[in-house]
Amino acid sequence: MAADRHPDVLVVGGGVIGLATAAALLERDPHRSVTVLERDFIGRGASMYPGAIDMPYFRTALHRQLVEASWAWHEARARETAAYRREVPMTWFVDAEIDLPSHVAPPLTSGARGIPPGWRAPEGVREVVGRSFVIDPEAWCQALAQEVTRSGRGQVVEHTPVVALDEDARGATVKCADGRTYSAGHVVLALGPWLPDWNERTRAWSANLGLRTKRVFGLNIAVDESLRANAAVGWPGADMYFHPAHGGGGYRLSLRHDEWGVDPDAPHEMADVVIERASGFLDLLLGKGRWSVSGHRVFVDSYTHEFEPVIAPCRALGERVTVATGTHGSGIRLAPGIAELTARTVLSSLDQKRGVA
């Protein structure tokens, strides 16, 4: 389609959240147009770093809603999603004090042994088996971008950093680094960890919400051939998740390490304490000398105190601005649910602005 500088909705941020939101908007309202503005290549921000395990784990009622909506979205598009999302059996290591069934959406099977031969569970945990999927985030972003452009009402513009946003009675206007402007009836900011410090107004707004950035660590793991299997393990009590990469050729280990207030554009180095924790877990699970670190992924995401995503108007920037952020390292697996909720919020605002009840 020809360049549209005046769409109904502008989405700033071409990661999986922004692209999924654009696709949801176009699907929900066949009369709307949407333009996605991405400062780099699509999917090259925080979306490219996660290990990308799609597990049905939730902490709160909103979190559960987003998990269930996301899984339903994928199941409704099973033929398309098979290209970038594949199933992996998940064994949960459950400590005595954790009521896992209250935090996992689909049914679980107690007593069934899920870990492969040669793998070992930590002492004192129960093993519970469930479903999970691994995702190729880059392939998914490409598929979402194609869905947006194929609609005939959407476009994706790369290498277009947005540096300012203003609003008047007619709508919102964003200014790009190259001087171009785009205007729309509504703007969605899907900036991931770049939102809190995007400008002074978002900085104050984020501080009021308790929205902060935190470093997130992941390791690429090579495993001895005799121990390789299409299997994943999750240990909520230790906040560790181990699973094969979507394309094969290795495994991914994600683990928590609290380092707050991090600039997403600063150099990110692996922390020794993270390697030590990973070693303790993998030596137990696989055995010493049976695995090695083949690479690492260090990135940044935004978090709230409640570990709940924020999908809300940002009146610090204007009445026509909605923010989708605070994904606490789970943006890949929650993206469809976040997109659906964001799309409903945006379309409701547009209808209200046009005087529709």
Regions found by a protein language model. Give the residues of each.
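Active-site substrate-recognition segment that forms the wall
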Residues: 23-24, 52-54, 83-87, 191-319
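Dinucleotide-binding Rossmann-like beta1-alpha1 core, especially the glycine-rich loop
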Residues: 51-125, 239-241
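Helix-loop-beta segment of a Rossmann-like dinucleotide-binding subdomain
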Residues: 82-92, 109-148, 256-262, 322-327
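Short hydrophobic core segments
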Residues: 10-12, 182-195, 339
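A conserved short coil-to-beta-strand element within the FAD-binding core of flavoproteins
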Residues: 155-172
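Glycine-rich FAD pyrophosphate-binding loop
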Residues: 26-47
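C-terminal catalytic lobe of FAD-dependent flavoproteins
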Residues: 287-357
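Beta1/beta-strand and adjacent pyrophosphate-binding region of the FAD-binding site
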Residues: 3-17, 35
